UniProtKB/Swiss-Prot annotation:
Superkingdom, taxonomy of origin: Bacteria
PANTHER family attached to this UniProt entry: LARGE RIBOSOMAL SUBUNIT PROTEIN UL2M, RIBOSOMAL PROTEIN L2
HAMAP family xrefs: Ribosomal_uL2_B (MF_01320_B)
Listed name of the protein: Large ribosomal subunit protein uL2
Chain positions covered by the region annotation Disordered: 225-277
């Protein structure tokens, strides 16, 4: 999808850059594949804020997306491509030969009337789902499972992908978007291709209101608070905070490594992630 620069007839439109979604379905989603969704507003079951800066936003219906892709050997035809307000990637509505409808993550380049299929023996084409052991080295994949039959977890956001590096016994080496090279069981499934909506990283919302529509509330800087509210707060006039950046609870941030040392999954990591500058 291309980018759309709006005519600056108002101040809020002056810097707005959006993704042109003219090729997407404009109607309602498939009724049998949506369920109600209640926004938590960043609260847990006790009503305590666990994620700050969340709340409000437009009402949304949850689309039931097939992340397991375990209907093997049955071809499915792409009926349409749709926008999903709950994720950055686009969805593809597919109809299987037996008449069943399903939503899948749309890879880049997938078009209406294209045919996708899952299972052993499938061609290595965008949208097809295979076991990692059946995918040749150098192929870009997305929606990768960490456990067989567990459903895709890795590389599901817009424009994301992982690259198959090679075989290592019962495992496959996979290079993730962070630069980390990880061993994953060859029986785990992945979908061929790069996730759709590559230009999502280039959009500019243009105004605070559009961020509120998405369910994000304002973020207040710590140095603008009082000492009771944040370690960076207080001081006469404007200050720099007087210390390295920390969270409201005093935990170092902005580059501090948060991964627990000695995790059992460390043995599956061949090359640690590289921080992007």
């Amino acid at each position: 999808m291309s980018l759309k620069v709006l005519n600056p007839v108002t101040p809020s439109l002056r810097g707005t850059v959006m993704v042109n979604r003219v090729a997407l379905w404009r109607g309602k989603p498939e009724k049998s594949l949506v369920v109600g969704r209640v926004s938590s507003g960043g609260r847990n079951a006790h009503g305590v804020i666990t994620v700050r800066h969340r709340g409000g936003g437009h009402k949304r219906l949850h689309r039931v997306v097939d992340l397991k892709r375990n209907k093997d050997g049955v071809q499915a035809v792409v009926q349409r491509l749709e926008y999903d307000p709950n994720r950055t990637a686009f969805l593809a509505l597919v109809r299987y030969e037996d008449g069943e409808l399903s939503y899948i993550l749309a890879p880049d380049g997938l078009k209406v009337s294209d045919v996708v299929v899952s299972g052993v023996g499938s061609d290595v084409l965008p949208g097809n789902c295979l076991q990692l052991g059946s995918i040749p080295a150098g192929t870009f994949v997305h929606n990768v499972e960490l456990r067989p039959c567990g459903g895709g977890i890795i590389a599901r956001a817009a424009g994301s992908y992982a690259q198959v590096m090679g075989r290592d016994g019962a495992y496959v080496l996979l290079r993730l978007g962070s630069g980390e090279v990880r061993k994953i069981l060859a029986l785990c499934r992945a979908t061929v291709g790069v996730v759709s909506n590559l230009n999502n990283q280039n959009i500019k919302l243009g105004k605070a209101g559009r961020n509120r529509w998405l369910g994000f509330r304002p973020t207040v800087r710590g140095v603008a608070m009082n000492p009771v509210d944040h370690p960076h707060g207080g001081g006469e006039g404007k200050t720099s905070g007087g210390r390295n950046s920390v969270t409201p609870w005093g935990v170092p941030t902005k580059g501090k490594k948060t991964r627990k040392r000695g995790k059992h999954s460390d043995k599956y990591i061949k090359v640690s992630s590289v921080r992007k500058r």
